[in-house]
Design a protein with these regions (language model features):
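Conserved helicase ATPase core of P-loop NTP-dependent helicases/translocases
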Residues: 382-407
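Walker A/P-loop
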Residues: 82-100
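Conserved P-loop NTPase motor "coupling/switch" region that bridges the ATPase
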Residues: 178, 195-285, 447-451
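Conserved SF2 helicase motif VI
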Residues: 431-447
């Protein structure tokens, strides 16, 4: 294979240069931090409901069937089981159901309930749980709830990692205490630091809340949740009990899946027992979306026109990768994504959509896509807001009709943007969970509109089309899979 187009070589060299410069910067920072005094013991915020910015949600109907009936069932399950997994669609009131369940538990206990809430940082910053609990307390003044703390997975991990603050947290939760885990799928890897830290609190009953508990590696996902439920003490313990260790492949995954994604139960019959165990912790009620006053969603799949220059540039990138000009497969895949998202036809279509809607949400993955979109918006005199990893959600102007750029990883979950009538999935990415979470940012109860439009932009190139199709089928794609796709479809 040869390439007369120098695009791939130029990009590979530019990435290598940037990495060298960043490496030097990191080395200097590391050098200057050598004599930094270690951090003190993490502080647990125990006065979370006194925040003056808390505003009780006024749209929650605590008497509707979805909230009261499901909340009662969840509360009973939480009392009887070490682990309960509540699965409900994004925006359908999972938080309200969970809070109602806590209220029912408190009635059963006959005294103030001890519980903590773990939620993504954007949810904590946005006071989502605070506002829901405050709304419950206003509706039920004789049965008010007061969480011991509301914290993030990262902060909880730091607290548990320190022996003194770990003991303080255990004492704070107390006997018969409960742990509420929002966006439970953040703990789907049983060997991650956050999961291992949470395992140290396995003596407490837990409620995990998510719309997307299982990915295409459902066995590992279920393993993680069952460890939280006390069915297994660790991943190794699960592998020993189930006999699945002999199916481990070179990447550490389990080679027990058929071509259609189903588990090969003939080779690994233990899967039936695992399913029975998972059903014991799972509660996935049917939800009448119409009764929740949620908007209808109209989806638009936008197949973009062919761009011969883009296709040529992608082939040039592939040539550079085969010549090993990229330091890693990650660098190559990012370069491919960046070229696709900088396609002028894609950017022009984006502008046409943005001009038709109020507060359109524009989802992107990599910073290069963000920069390309911002440049195009500025070119057309369109102001914008940005939600990325460093954004304080309180700074977002919810009343503005300007488009909001949202990074999938930073803002796909636990953010409510109820004035928006449009979502544009500008950049296709590799996670089905991120896609589902992104869809729910403006499809929620008590919206300002009865109809929300979702746009999916797909370039006329095999790689982008395959990426869209596989993620929409529910797959979570690793770099190894993406590399195979790039080899086949570019």
């Amino acid at each position: 294979m040869s390439s007369k187009n120098p695009y791939g070589i130029i990009v590979a060299r530019a990435i290598a240069k940037r990495k060298r410069e960043r490496g030097l910067e990191k080395a200097e920072k590391k050098k200057s931090k050598k004599n930094v005094i270690p951090k003190n013991k993490p502080v647990i915020d125990v006065d979370v409901m006194s925040n003056p910015k808390i505003k009780p949600y006024d749209y929650i109907d605590w008497s509707d069937a979805s909230t009261s009936k499901n909340g009662t069932v969840v509360g009973e399950r939480m009392r009887e089981s070490q682990m309960t997994l509540l699965k409900m669609p994004t925006g359908s009131g999972k938080t309200a159901v969970s809070v109602y369940a806590l209220g029912e538990l408190q009635k059963k206990h006959g005294k103030p309930l001890s519980f903590i809430v773990i939620a993504p940082s954007k949810t904590v910053e946005g006071l989502g749980w605070h506002n829901t609990i405050a709304a419950y307390n206003r509706a039920f003044p004789d049965n008010q709830l007061y969480p011991k703390t509301i914290t993030t997975p990262g902060k909880l991990s730091n607290i548990i990692a320190h022996p003194t603050s770990q003991l303080e947290m255990i004492k704070l939760i107390g006997n018969n205490g409960y742990i509420i885990i929002d966006e439970l799928h953040l703990y789907k890897n049983p060997t991650s630091k956050r999961s291992k830290m949470l395992h140290k609190l396995n003596m407490f009953h837990k409620l995990g809340v998510t719309a997307t508990p299982l990915t295409n590696d459902r066995v590992l996902d279920m393993c993680s949740y069952l460890i939280l439920g006390g069915y297994y003490s660790s991943k190794n313990n699960f592998e020993d009990k189930s006999g699945i260790k002999s199916f481990k492949n070179e990447f550490g995954g389990y080679g027990i899946y058929l071509f259609d994604g189903n588990v090969n139960t003939f080779a690994w019959p233990y899967y039936f027992q695992m399913l029975d165990e998972f059903k014991e912790i799972l509660y996935a009620p049917s939800v009448d979306i119409k009764s929740l006053d949620m908007p209808d969603v109209e989806s638009h799949i936008i197949q973009l026109e062919e761009n011969e220059q883009m296709l040529s540039d992608l082939k040039s990138l592939k040539y550079a990768q085969r010549k090993r000009m990229f330091d890693s497969i990650t660098d190559y895949l990012i370069a491919v994504a960046n070229r696709i998202t900088r396609d002028e036809k894609r950017l022009d279509k984006l502008i046409k959509i943005v001009k038709k809607h109020k507060q359109p949400l524009i989802f992107y993955r990599y910073n290069d896509a963000r920069d390309a979109v911002i440049e195009k918006l500025n070119e057309h005199g369109i102001s914008h807001q940005l939600i990325s990893g460093n954004t304080n959600f309180e700074e977002i102007d919810h009343s503005s009709t300007a488009p909001i750029l949202i990074q999938y990883q930073a803002g796909a979950a636990s953010i409510e943007l109820k004035n928006s009538d449009c979502t544009i999935f500008y950049e296709n990415q590799s996670s089905h969970i991120s896609l589902i979470q992104g869809r729910g940012r403006n499809v929620r109860r008590a919206m300002e509109t009865d109809l929300v439009h979702h746009y999916y932009l797909i370039s006329d190139c095999g790689f982008d089309q395959e990426l869209y199709e596989r993620v929409h089928r529910g797959e979570e794609l690793s770099n190894e899979i993406l590399e195979e796709m790039a080899e086949e479809f570019i």
